[in-house]
Amino acid sequence: MYHPYLRGKQNELILLRENAKLLSDAGMIPIIEPVKKNLAPLEKAIESLSKENVPFILIVNPRNGDFKNDSLPLFSDLIDTTLKDYEQFCLGYIVDAESTLLDIKSFLDDNITRSISFIHNGYPKANELANVLKDFDNVKKHIFIDKKSQN
């Protein structure tokens, strides 16, 4: 399964919007990391994806951009509104060296009714994470970022 990782910049969102049918036909599942406070372009891209029934993963704890320190607007202005009736998406949660088990558990508890995908990017406590995740059947995917591909 191919998961193109997009930072949610204007050109990337236009690409998603204009190629939603192609993504659907190819079975690709894009991962979108929102970086801009203005969610209107992202909403347009999501509208195109939903028309073609394209599944996607929306990162809710971005490591870059305007939502890096406050992702609450992603929930209040997008997930709980625009996406509330669309079932073909997962909340994506990045687990890396900055992540804590307490934050991960809190996120899972807060989103027990939603589909979750974990984006693994060098999280150092894999065994402890596995113990936390075993209690949650809403975790649908684990995607691992290859450190070599980031250079």
Sequence positions of predicted segments:
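N-terminal basic/disordered segments at the start of proteins
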Residues: 1-26, 36
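Structural motif
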Residues: 2-4, 55, 142
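Internal, hydrophobic cores of structured domains that mediate oligomerization or house catalytic pockets
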Residues: 75-151
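Detector for Asparagine
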Residues: 11, 19, 38, 53, ...
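An N-terminal, globular interaction/scaffold subdomain
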Residues: 27-104
